[in-house]
């Protein structure tokens, strides 16, 4: 979903009587629609408040354990040998490491023991092979200057719930009951994702953090 789409969908939740029809595939059309809305005194304050609310939503999603898991692989030769263990600088991986797997021609070992020491990943030396680091990537935060066509790289089932969280944040001082109702819808949707998802079942996105 594009950032401009998210803001417009949230605005239509806040103001159910308005209908904003815009060709989201057209970058110019989305920019124009959002610019016109920002110029309207009825909507500008709500749109301005959405940047912080969206970033708070990202933080909330990271705490829920619902984000798609990504992975990247390393050869054992990429690690530094320290006594009977291997050490690797993983400072370029931005997110929470969920597990480490190992494989070679003879064996496959899942959920290897690992520890984190600063920016270093420490694993047992299992010989020559490939280590797969599975992690939940941090969501990049947006700024007030982030454009309407910025892509929020999250599954549709997650982005479809975000307007409820954002609405609950930006109308809290205006209508606390309506804000609570919107947050409840968001939390219910997130709970459904948690109950129905096998997180280890959708690791299809590969982020090339390091060259193997």
Question: Model-flagged regions — what are they?
Answer:
Residues 1-212:
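Glycine-enriched, solvent-exposed interface loops adjoining structured elements
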């Amino acid at each position: 979903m594009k950032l401009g789409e998210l803001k417009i969908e949230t605005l239509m939740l806040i103001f159910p009587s308005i209908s904003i029809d815009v060709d989201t595939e057209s970058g110019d059309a989305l920019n124009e629609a959002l610019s016109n809305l920002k110029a309207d005194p009825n909507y500008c304050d709500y749109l301005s408040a959405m940047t912080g609310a969206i970033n708070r939503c990202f933080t909330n999603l990271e705490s829920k354990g619902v984000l798609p898991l990504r992975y990247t692989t390393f050869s054992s030769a990429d690690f530094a040998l320290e006594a009977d263990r291997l050490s690797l600088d993983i400072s370029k991986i931005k997110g929470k490491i969920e597990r480490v797997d190992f494989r070679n021609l003879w064996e496959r070992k899942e959920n290897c023991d690992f520890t984190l020491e600063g920016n270093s990943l420490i694993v047992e030396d299992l010989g020559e092979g490939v280590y797969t680091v599975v992690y939940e990537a941090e969501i990049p935060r947006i700024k007030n200057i982030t454009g309407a066509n910025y892509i929020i790289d999250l599954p549709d089932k997650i982005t479809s719930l975000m307007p409820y969280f954002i609405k609950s944040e930006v109308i809290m001082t205006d209508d606390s009951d309506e804000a609570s109702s919107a947050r409840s819808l968001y939390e219910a949707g997130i709970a459904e994702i948690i109950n129905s998802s096998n997180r280890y079942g959708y690791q299809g996105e590969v982020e090339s953090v390091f060259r193997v």
